[in-house]
């Protein structure tokens, strides 16, 4: 998918959903005024590059059991999570801009995330790491090349790149529209 615009959908859950898909590449595209999730990736391999996400009602990119690379993309005014890595996903983020989002980056449920040189500006939360489903292990993240200012991190979660972490408890109770984010439909 190259040089495409996805905007103003009026109904439905995900604008695009990939299920057990390989070698998906989205470049030079725009997702704008999306009702719920812009991209949902289930058990898929996905590269998103030089793509803009703006005014998204839920998540910008939501992955479960997926391998996702996001490079040189922009996320503005995402009402829940700009990027959400869940259920044993591997996410690599590089040189993205996250601005004025509810939550910029989330890693959960035995997922691994690397963030390199991402820029975070005026997000309600820059980063969240927790275990939502207890049958998964804790997630892990390497944020050593990204400046994270505000976060929620579950105790014992392995996070490289943040010093003197102040761990939080009951993170899930603070998300999904309770304090942060948006309730799922």
Task: State what each model feature region is.
Residues 1-185:
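Extracellular beta-rich repeat passengers
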């Amino acid at each position: 998918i190259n040089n495409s615009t996805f905007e103003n959908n009026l109904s439905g859950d995900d604008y695009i959903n990939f299920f057990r898909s390989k070698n998906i590449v989205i470049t030079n595209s725009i997702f704008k005024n999306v009702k719920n999730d812009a991209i949902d990736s289930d058990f898929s391999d996905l590269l998103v590059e030089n793509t803009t996400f703006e005014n998204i009602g839920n998540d910008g990119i939501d992955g479960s059991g997926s391998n996702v690379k996001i490079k040189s993309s922009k996320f503005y005014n995402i009402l829940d999570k700009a990027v959400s890595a869940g259920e044993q996903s591997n996410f690599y983020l590089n040189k993205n801009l996250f601005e004025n989002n509810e939550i910029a980056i989330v890693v959960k449920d035995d997922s691994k995330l690397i963030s390199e040189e991402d820029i975070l500006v005026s997000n309600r939360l820059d980063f969240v790491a927790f275990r939502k489903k207890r049958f998964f292990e804790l997630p892990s993240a390497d944020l050593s090349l990204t400046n994270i200012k505000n976060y929620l991190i579950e105790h014992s979660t392995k996070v490289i790149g943040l010093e003197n972490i102040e761990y939080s408890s009951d993170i899930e109770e603070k998300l999904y529209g309770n304090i942060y984010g948006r309730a799922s439909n």
